[in-house]
């Protein structure tokens, strides 16, 4: 579960390395976000040559969470870290590559571009 002030790794090559959640999109009192949810993030660490600079505000979709969550079939899954992918206004990733595994739930939430770029879907 991701909430405001949570820090996440960036799982793409957009240039951002570490981001901090500043808003969970979807309702004025929504507190938590999980896999497939869109959040607004502030870039805390970025490569100096990247288009995305430190301090910029971007939208991102969560692809991995450390907290285990229940799937529809009754199984539970968790990852080693909290990670997100920076997206544009249309929901497409800003980077051209995705690093590490991503959750299968992204396919059902119309993030097929992220799923197709990912090396492993769990």
Swiss-Prot record:
A family per Pfam: Ribosomal_L14
Instruction: Give the GO biological process terms.
Output: translation
UniProt KW keywords: Ribonucleoprotein, Ribosomal protein, RNA-binding, rRNA-binding
Q: Could you tell me which SMART domains the record lists for this protein?
A: Ribosomal_L14
Q: How does it assemble?
A: Part of the 50S ribosomal subunit. Forms a cluster with proteins L3 and L19. In the 70S ribosome, L14 and L19 interact and together make contacts with the 16S rRNA in bridges B5 and B8. Interacts with ribosomal silencing factor RsfS, which may inhibit ribosomal subunit association.
Explain the purpose of this protein. Answer: Binds to 23S rRNA. Forms part of two intersubunit bridges in the 70S ribosome.
Q: Which named protein is this?
A: Large ribosomal subunit protein uL14
Source species: Treponema pallidum (strain Nichols)
